[in-house]
A protein has these predicted regions:
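Non-cytoplasmic
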Residues: 192-242, 249
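C-terminal transmembrane helix and the adjacent membrane-cytosol boundary/short C-terminal tail
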Residues: 98, 235-264
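Generic hydrophobic transmembrane alpha-helix motif, especially the helices
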Residues: 109-146, 153-154
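Short cytoplasmic-facing helical segments at TM-TM junctions of multi-pass membrane proteins
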Residues: 153-189, 221
Length: 264
């Protein structure tokens, strides 16, 4: 029995290596090519910094990058949670009252088409310069639309045979929602989260370019570029990449836990 468990564990481990391996190999090859290009063509730091210099600046400024990441990450997390809750709530409303979808959807599309910098500029004028609210509101809006579209699709695009079977047993609309629509929408929710999680970091990051406190990753990148410290700026970009990767990884872990819960 223990031998079978060991074999099963080995197979799963090998499967994970096969999934991650190509990405790791590609990443290492890309960094090696980047480093070689900078050294081979003698590119100046103000044009393109070498990965070795970026890594050096990353560890040299680690505490500052961490502080900036907590600010940007905090704004992204607040917006992600609020946007997800609002998106789920509105998707339930739209699935119950279909006529509202015809009214809300065009407005949502129009609002989502407005460039980030325009909305951030308007929000910055509405609040004090020391407020983090504009950035969090911007993240909330981006996440809200992603979650709304996906979850609403999961709630409405169910098999008609399942709904008809429930109705043949005189099931209420709430029972149909709980037994059919919600289980069907769960995969759509996690698909939305895997998109919204890194998008929340990107939005918080970009929002910092257009005013407000100069304490996040985007602001630090701008200030370092202005002072011709390109390697340091790239180090903050690396911090932003790691932050986005962390958010995405958490969304995958949550999906895995949900699947294990369903299996039980």
């Amino acid at each position: 029995m223990s031998g079978a468990n060991t074999t099963s564990t080995s197979v799963r481990s090998f499967g994970r290596v096969r999934q991650v391996g190509p990405a790791v190999v590609f990443g290492v090859a890309f960094l090696a090519l980047w480093e070689s290009a900078v050294r081979g063509f003698d590119l100046k730091p103000y044009f393109l910094a070498a990965p070795s210099k970026i890594g050096e600046q990353f560890f040299k400024n680690y505490s500052r990058i961490w502080d900036a990441s907590t600010v940007s990450g905090g704004n992204a997390l607040v917006g992600l949670v609020v946007g997800t809750v609002l998106g789920i709530a509105m998707s339930f409303i739209l699935s119950r009252y279909r006529f509202l979808g015809e009214l809300v959807t065009p407005l949502a599309i129009a609002l989502n088409a407005i460039p980030i910098f325009v909305l951030v500029a308007i929000l910055n004028n509405m609040y004090s310069i020391t407020s983090e609210i504009p950035r969090r509101v911007m993240v909330t809006l981006v996440v809200y639309f992603i979650v709304l579209v996906n979850v609403a699709k999961g709630l409405t695009q169910v098999r008609s045979t399942h709904v008809e079977l429930m109705r043949s047993y005189a099931a209420s609309e709430f029972a149909i929602l709980r037994k059919v629509r919600v289980p069907n929408a769960v995969p759509y929710l996690f698909t939305a989260l895997k998109v919204a999680a890194p998008a929340s970091v990107i939005t918080a990051f970009v929002s910092e370019y257009f005013g407000g406190l100069q304490n996040g990753l985007g602001s630090r990148i701008t200030s370092n570029i202005a002072n011709s410290k390109n390697a340091a700026a790239w180090a903050y970009v690396l911090g932003a990449c790691l932050l986005g990767l962390a958010f995405y990884t958490v969304s995958i872990i949550l999906e895995s836990l949900a699947r294990k819960g369903e299996a039980k």
